[in-house]
Amino acid sequence: YDIERAGIHSYRYRTKNPMHLLEKIIRKRKENYAKFEHINKSNYHKYITDLIGIRVFFLYREDWIHFHKFITSMFENDPNNYVEDRLRDFDEDPEHCYIAERPKVYKRSGDTRIYDSTQIEVRTGGYYRSLHYIIKYHGYYLEIQGRTLFEEGWSEIDHDIVYPYYKDDEMLTEFSGLLNRLSGMA
């Protein structure tokens, strides 16, 4: 497989900012204490699945299948490896690289039905659109997200303007929803 056959137009990557990591740990522990009760400085990498984030961009949503075939050819995709308990199920072998959760796609209600639910878990509802793959890679989890360039553009604007400050602004929320629907047409 090469990057073009995988349907990838471009990509970005980042490592999690330490302050954002700390905020996320505090938030997660507050939201679900039982699940995150034992998280600490020596095991947080077993809980946090996006210490490293890679976002790939497609021109067309239909390109998802090419990327899915690419990623499942690069990493073992065995449901027996899917992590349920972050501490118990963590594979300590740093050389064992695999898909650690069932691949998911978040789509909006009304989106065309291009996803094959036998290959990827389909979650519908809300405005969020993205493919998600959690990969165990050399002792750490990394998250790979995939979306179209249009979906990324809308998401960046929404996250920059609406999300942090104006979630309750009816006009901005309506405008953001319109942009979301338009981005989904590509």
What is each of the regions a protein language model found here?
Residues 32-33, 37, 41, 45, ...:
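Surface-exposed peri-terminal alpha-helical interaction modules
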